[in-house]
Amino acid sequence: MGLDNIVVKGARSHNLKNIDVTIPRDKLVVLTGLSGSGKSSLAFDTIYAEGQRRYVESLSAYARQFLGQMDKPDVDSIEGLSPAISIDQKTTSRNPRSTVGTVTEIFDYLRLLYARIGKPVCPKHGIEISSQTVQQMVDRILSYEERTKLQILAPLVSGRKGTHVKVLEDIKKQGFVRVRIDGEMREVAEEIELDKNKKHTIEVVIDRIVVKEGIETRLADSLETALQLADGRVVVDIIGKEELLFSQHHACPQCGFSIPELEPRMFSFNSPFGACPTCDGLGVKLEVDLELVIPDRSRTLSENAIAPWEPISSQYYPQMLEAVCNHYGIDMDTPVEQLPDHQLEKILYGSGHEKIFFRYENDLGQVRENEILFEGVIPNVKRRYHETSSDYIRDQLEAYMAQKACPTCKGHRLKKEALAVLIGGKHLGEVTKLSIKEAKTFFESLELSKKDFSIARLILKEINDRLGFLMNVGLDYLTLSRSAGTLSGGEAQRIRLATQIGSSLMGVLYILDEPSIGLHQRDNDRLISTLAHMRDLGNTLIVVEHDEDTMLAADYIIDIGPGAGVHGGQVTAAGSPEEIMNDAKSLTGQYLSGKKFIPIPSERRQPNGRSFTVKGASENNLKQVNVEFPLGVFIAVTGVSGSGKSTLINEIVHKALAQKLHRAKDKPGKHKEIVGIEHVDKVIDIDQSPIGRTPRSNPATYTGVFDDIRDVFAMTNEAKVRGYKKGRFSFNVKGGRCEACRGDGIIKIEMHFLPDVYVPCEVCHGKRYNRETLDITYKGKTIADVLDMTVEEALEFFTNIPRIKRKIQTLVDVGLGYIKLGQPATTLSGGEAQRVKLASQLHKRATGKTLYILDEPTTGLHVDDIDRLLKVLQRIVDNGDTVLVIEHNLDVIKTVDHIIDLGPEGGDKGGTIVAQGTPEEVVEVEGSYTGKYLRPILERDRKRMDSRIREHELQRS
């Protein structure tokens, strides 16, 4: 039994209720259940942690200190465990040197390919650079037919200015008769005078030969003479036909551009042998950006239009600016956009050699007067950035700088010698700029000589296989040069999935966390067949997933529940998809079988007449699109992966509105303008990033309800008698907190060779507060007891205090009744963090002018959670505000009022508007993939709703 199954006994990690689970081996197993029900606790914190721990335990103590040690999970036993590999969404590298090519190891094979069969070509003259022996040169010349006339020349001067008198004298002394100067034959005996200001080419005629039998020796002697004379170069003029250039060195015979011996490290931008010397292999340089220096050109100089010189701490730069304006007669009360170019030029780039009178008065009234050379705002920011040793100042100045493509390597990251090596007419930089689909076509259609093919056969197989795996997981639109840090969680996970398939391991336990995130329904089938392929290799796959198609394709489903948090942690159902559907206890089964479903709204909202329009959006792959966003409705932006959704919403709409409305520093993506901004007064991005980076942040502090709770404790009679104010009940400041653990409740003990151990503070026993503070009670509970309550318990406890009840009620509304008020932010999942943020917005008053942006809010959510989330989002829209989601989930798309569908494909073939309108209008559009997959869902759910209505009518009658 142990061999066919993984048997978990007594799992108690987090909220798991001492459960026993049997997971079949070598099968595709889906773990599902509500958000917070304990799926990740079972998959990652129990099974993966134990599999990884057992493997690491087998290594030496020395090796263990370099590996992330896993805590021993709280479980009685796990049998039948294999080495475990976790593919989650958190581990994308933020390193700018990490690209799709390096992460998938395709780049390593490309380097090897270029080093072995690449053809060096002079970038200036387009001549192939190769070193040849005299024997090879003779054979090449003798390949011409008999009686071909030719002359052998030694190129002494190639395109250099001067009279070259000495060169000509040397030729005469050595007894040569003819010379070719600038393409014209001359006798050496002539008086030759050259114009010293023009470039000249001088070639000595060594020999004139007619191709015939027995000429080899003479030909070889003449070639050797020419090579000796011209430093290893020779020109063979086939009279009336062509000229051949030969070189004994790895160098261009015309300009001498040379390339060292080709080796893989020469093509690595992470090695000093291959990296571009200007940008050190990053492909970009940080340059001062004029748009960030003057973010709002409608402001005047006296209104601090020049952002880096705002008078925050010192008046030095504002006074200098005033001196420059006085000197050049520049009006400081004219908006910057109306200033003449020559005046703005002086402010931005300096006075050159012209001196300016500068009088500076500091805060103490001391005056300094001087004649100065004014360097200009942009050179000033650049100089201070490079000269400062303060990280704080460097971070401040970086806000006015932007990444620009490196001028030397044009963003290709490699030095010019590496970029001079071509295969199929493309250098390595150009190949990595191709999308994965284009790269696959390029390598499959590559025409190679027999010799090159035999060398490259295995390398090309590896490259093509890996490109194929990436296409199978729906990533054909990515380029190999795409920085890993810019990938979404789902993309990064699918890349690692493709890399794992490339390794072709068997007998491994893979644990995946929602691989379908960010994937359009169209590409889902390819992902599922990839997972099935990994299973068929002989691996066990445990997939934490909510996607209906993946669940139906699984061999075995384990439904964790029945609720979330304290109400979860049990196995409610386990079996094949059919068995789950027929199990009345399984919430997932009810949704899979259609007994439960998310209803379609009976009617779509009409826009309120107001809208804003983005014009000429052209960032990344957007094709100069104009998009109108109606306000007062629920909008979904849809489209296949890589079609430009995130670019349009996150890079342009969010950043441009935040810059205009909240004076944010982030520079928006390329677009002409946004019309109608006056209809929006706030833009709020509710993403899945943590609500805090430390355990001190928790739902109570984030939603602001903790302030009100502390007020309640400060108002108790005992607190008043003791003179305790609200601050006494904060665990972040001295006074009321336990000083032994500084209000953390736990103490970290560092262990070498073992993971760090966290133990409860022995002074306060994890309560965070000192004894005096805990003497104060409200309705019999201390402040520590309140933090330990679940949201549901707190709602009941504070039911008589409206302002607290209102804030806690919003947490219940978004489905977070099970989390504790004081639960550390670091332990919340992405979906939970996002819902805490939503809750904190819900209790604020609606203005009717707020735009909420959510990027894939359904990540990590079960269908039942999505139902609850949609009710909250619809409530926000009912209040008059606008909700804009980027989404692939058809359950969400079917309930919105307005769809903007981008596409038609991903990458270069995307970036246009395919369809827009209500879901009913979009399904009628021929080229819309979203419409194609949405149509059957709308039809299915309409039928379900009709039958539901009929059932109700029958029950009534």
UniProtKB/Swiss-Prot annotation:
Keyword Zinc included in the entry's annotation: yes
Start and end residues, zinc fingers (C4-type): 252-279, 738-764
UniProt keywords, alphabetically: ATP-binding, Cytoplasm, DNA damage, DNA excision, DNA repair, DNA-binding, Excision nuclease, Metal-binding, Nucleotide-binding, Repeat, SOS response, Zinc, Zinc-finger
Protein's recorded name: UvrABC system protein A
Keyword check for DNA repair: yes
NCBIfam families: PRK00349.1 (NF001503), uvra (TIGR00630)
Binding site for ATP: 33-40, 639-646
Primary localization class, coarse: cytoplasm
PANTHER family noted in UniProt: UVRABC SYSTEM PROTEIN A (PTHR43152:SF3)
One Pfam family linked to the record: UvrA_DNA-bind
GO cellular component terms listed in the entry, alphabetical order: cytoplasm; excinuclease repair complex
